[in-house]
Design a protein with these regions (language model features):
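Acidic, serine/threonine-rich low-complexity disordered tracts
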Residues: 1-47, 77-163
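Hydrophobic, well-structured mid-protein blocks that either form specific transmembrane helices
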Residues: 30-72
Length: 163
């Protein structure tokens, strides 16, 4: 919950399960409540068609297996041309651009990162549906360490620790 003067202006609660076989996604399920609105995704890999079958709150249909789940902690999102929304199942084309190398300081430790910009390929999408994220990736640990974006305020996600 995000509260402003005692009033909830944003809330999100969700749960998701991803299953991989031989490093390939075969199943994804999520249920999310965002601002009291239920969102969901049920994705399964169909062996016959070799495609993902998606039943989501904003999209139902097929998607190619070159899509990745739009999860900020999956570095494969930086190599993909399409992502599946982990909240609603919508499929969006994306463009990932390298910005520059940067050092990040997280919890007193310095990390070398590659800074990327991830944007929607389709500029005609409404602003609230567009992808527009800054992502910092650490090659040494093969991890996304930070993601930031501006939508209903400025948001920043940082990885606190890892094993």
């Amino acid at each position: 919950n995000v509260d402003l003067f005692g009033v909830s202006i944003f809330s999100i609660l969700g749960e998701a399960t991803e299953v991989y076989e031989d490093n390939k996604l075969i199943y994804f399920k999520s249920n999310t409540f965002q601002n009291n609105k239920e969102k969901f995704v049920n994705l399964k890999f169909d062996k016959k068609s070799k495609k993902f079958i998606i039943n989501g709150s904003s999209f139902s249909g097929e998607a190619s297996t070159d899509c990745v789940i739009g999860n900020w902690w999956n570095h494969k999102i930086l190599q993909a041309n399409k992502q599946v929304s982990p909240l609603s199942g919508s499929v969006k084309d994306q463009i990932v651009t390298f910005i520059k190398k940067e050092d990040l300081l997280i919890n007193g430790k310095k990390y070398s990162t590659d800074h990327f910009k991830l944007k929607s390929k389709d500029d005609t999408l409404p602003d609230d549906k567009k992808l527009d994220f800054d992502i910092w990736y650490n090659k040494e640990n093969n991890l996304i360490l930070k993601v930031s974006y501006t939508r209903m305020g400025s948001w920043e996600y940082r990885l606190k620790n890892f094993k």
